[in-house]
Regions:
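Phosphate/diphosphate ligand-binding glycine-rich loop within oxidoreductases
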Residues: 1-99
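Rossmann-like adenosine-cofactor binding region
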Residues: 140-178
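Conserved beta-strand positions in the Rossmann-like core of class I SAM-dependent methyltransferases
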Residues: 23, 108, 131
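NAD(P)-binding Rossmann-fold cofactor-contacting core
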Residues: 125-143
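Short glycine-rich anion-binding loops that position phosphate/pyrophosphate groups of nucleotides
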Residues: 47-54, 114-115, 163-166
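Glycine-rich adenosine-cofactor-binding loop
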Residues: 1, 84-89, 96-126, 134
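Flexible, charged surface loops at secondary-structure boundaries
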Residues: 37-39, 101-103, 124, 150-156, ...
Length: 178
């Protein structure tokens, strides 16, 4: 995960944070979260693909925004409670600002997991039309095979919410008509 390196650099560069550590818990199943979620030595957890939706059932509380989004990527341990938040929405908004994107006519969302729920939430809040694409067709989603170039016409923002293109699959890309 990119997060470990990022946070360790932050902790090591700040004398007030030098006692902190960041550990990856790579789990094969969400059920394995039980092995460490109640560890009193942990200050919190980050949640990544594919558990941002499934982790909700293990929490005591969830922020209103995370509830609306339907996905959690940050768990804080406060007063003996496991509280879930979604900070992906903040990161998504900030990445748009940093990219100087001024106009979005529509959004094409690749993938159907927790990250896609964040982008859907953003689109709904900003009245931006969107389409969801995935490998498999479903009620709310087109399959990659069903689309053509016309879906990408205009000021379309394409958001990859799949694990494809991230470590270790950095040279792969979703199967869409580029």
């Amino acid at each position: 995960s990119f997060s470990r390196k990022y946070f360790l650099e932050k902790f090591n560069s700040n004398p007030y944070l030098s006692d902190y550590n960041y550990i990856n818990f790579d789990i094969e199943s969400i059920d394995l979260i039980k092995d460490f979620i109640d560890d009193k030595d942990l200050g919190g957890l980050n949640v990544t693909i594919p558990y941002k939706i499934e982790v909700i059932e293990y929490l005591d509380e969830i922020s209103d925004e995370a509830k609306e989004i339907g996905a959690v990527n940050t768990i804080c341990f406060e007063d003996g409670k496991r509280i879930g938040y979604n900070t992906d929405i903040y990161g998504f908004k900030e990445s748009l600002k940093a990219s100087s994107i001024n106009r979005i006519d529509s959004v094409v969302i690749l993938g159907t997991g927790g990250a896609s729920k964040t982008v859907i939430y953003f689109c709904k809040k900003n009245n931006i039309p969107y389409k969801i694409l995935s490998r498999k067709k479903s009620k709310d989603c087109l399959s990659y095979k069903e689309i053509n170039h016309s879906i990408f016409e205009g000021n379309v923002l394409i958001v990859n919410c799949t694990p494809i293109g991230t470590h270790p699959k950095i040279n792969e890309c979703p199967d869409i008509p580029y």
